[in-house]
Design a protein with these regions (language model features):
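Conserved catalytic or regulatory cores that recognize and/or transform ribose-phosphate-containing ligands
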Residues: 1-152
Length: 152
């Protein structure tokens, strides 16, 4: 039996709307599933956050939204994934959590696919450029690279 193919779907959450955090991830999960690739969303099982207009640090007392809950599961997901897809499109402020996930993915030797504008993204930085094995300008291109990584 072939090992399940996992890709972690990283990107800004703090300061975004619930749908802003989930819509692109749900799309990616649906598209990757067509190729038997499982997308791991840090927003899974967090429907309780829908009631909030914007997601900000400390917004919920739910165990999955606690400091430990977020960090523990996200690190575990990055560690067990085979690749990471970072969607930084349209970011309005630096996503500290996503930058930490870049560090984890690097430490765990995961291939990086970064989806980011060619110019003007607030995350534009030498280390992000260096860590990004693949950099594309839209989500569909990013998903195509992920599929290519798993084409064996």
């Amino acid at each position: 039996m072939q090992k399940e193919k996992l890709v972690y779907l990283a990107g800004p959450i703090d300061g975004c709307t619930y749908s802003g955090c989930t819509d692109w991830r749900e799309y990616a999960i649906k598209e990757l599933k067509k190729d038997n690739i499982t997308g791991l969303s840090p927003m899974r099982a967090k429907e309780f956050l829908k009631e909030h207009p914007k997601l900000v640090d400390g917004i919920s007392k739910h165990v999955l939204a606690s400091d430990a809950g977020i960090t523990t599961r996200d690190m575990w997901d990055v560690r067990r994934s085979d690749a990471t897809l970072f969607n930084l499109l349209g970011a309005e402020k630096v996503s500290i959590g996503t930058m930490i996930e870049y560090g984890w993915a690097s430490a765990f030797n995961k291939p990086f696919v970064t989806v980011m504008e060619k110019q003007g993204n607030i995350h534009e930085h030498a280390m992000i450029r260096r860590l990004s094995g693949y950099r594309v300008e839209n989500l569909d291109e990013g998903l195509a690279v992920v599929r290519a990584l798993f084409a064996y």
